[in-house]
Every structure is written in structure tokens, then in C-alpha cells.
A protein has these predicted regions:
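Short, acidic/turn-prone active-site loops that include or flank metal/cofactor-
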Residues: 5-8, 78-79, 140
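Active-site HxH/HxHxD metal-binding segment of metal-dependent hydrolases
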Residues: 1-40
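Metallo-beta-lactamase
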Residues: 30, 40, 47-128, 137-138
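Short, hinge-like loop/turn segments at secondary-structure boundaries
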Residues: 17-22, 93, 133-135
């Protein structure tokens, strides 16, 4: 399951795929299911909403769903949780500060109980505060 920009990157297997950062070849693959921003799909009986949040890379997407009465968000690489003030890595080939900042603004409006990032610690307490911290750090660093 992927948004169009990610599907294009993994189908091409080009420098947008992180294997190149480690001098590895990325074997191209075809995405089974394309989704668009705001689209809902079902996986194992769970309804999941895709939220396209480009900037870190043009295909960054968060996935929102409910599980046992809790609102969860899989944020992937949209936000890092390794360090306070750290808002994620800005070194990808298609990174864009302006677009990323707008995505953080949009993501800061999402209310969830648990955030599962691509890197760092899972947030069990007010994940939106972490997103707001990241947005503030980005705004301060890039003004």
C-alpha cells in the first residue's frame, strides 16, 4: 500500500530509494495497492486512512486507524522521535523544506493516542505535542 510518489520511486528503484544511501541496489517492486490522500482502505478488517505528508520525501504518508478504542497513527518518516527538537532527517534527495513545514502544520492537527514513528520511540502520551515540538523546531531552524 503506497501513495503515488512512493509507488513511482519503488517501481523505478532509483536514487529516491534509501538503499542508495548505503551503496546498495534497490530491487524495483510494484506496489499492490495505490492510495490517495484521505483515502480509506481496509486491512485485516481494520479501516485505515492514508494521509499524504510530503517533504521529508515526496511520498511520505501517515496511516491513521483505531484499534481497541485507541486512535493510532503510523507516522513513518514524517517525524523523528530520536531527540527532543529533532524533527526528522532532511537529507533525502527529494526533501523540500517548505512542503515539509506545511506537512508538519497539517500533521499537528491530528489527534491520536499513540504514534508509531519510523525511527525512535513510540509515543503513548499526547503524540500531537511531539509533532508541535517538531514543527516549532523546524520553524526556528529554517526561518
Amino acid at each position: 500500500v503506497a501513495i503515488g510518489e512512493t509507488a513511482d520511486a519503488v517501481a523505478a528503484g532509483d536514487e529516491r530509494c534509501c538503499g542508495y544511501l548505503y551503496h546498495k541496489i534497490f530491487t524495483p517492486v510494484t506496489v499492490d495497492q495505490l492510495v490517495k490522500d484521505g483515502e480509506k482502505f481496509s486491512l485485516l478488517g481494520v479501516e485505515i486512512e492514508a494521509m499524504h505528508l510530503p517533504g521529508h520525501s515526496m511520498g511520505c504518508t501517515a496511516f491513521l486507524f483505531e484499534w481497541t478504542g485507541k486512535k493510532l497513527v503510523i507516522s513513518g518518516d514524517v517525524i523523528g522521535t530520536l531527540l527532543v527538537g529533532d524533527f526528522g532527517w532532511d537529507g533525502s534527495i527529494d526533501f523540500d523544506k517548505k512542503i515539509y513545514t506545511e506537512s508538519l502544520r497539517r500533521f499537528a492537527k491530528v489527534d491520536s493516542d499513540i504514534m508509531l514513528p519510523g525511527h525512535g520511540m513510540i509515543y503513548f502520551h499526547k503524540p500531537r505535542r511531539r509533532v508541535e515540538q517538531a514543527l516549532n523546531a523546524a520553524l526556528m531552524q529554517w526561518r
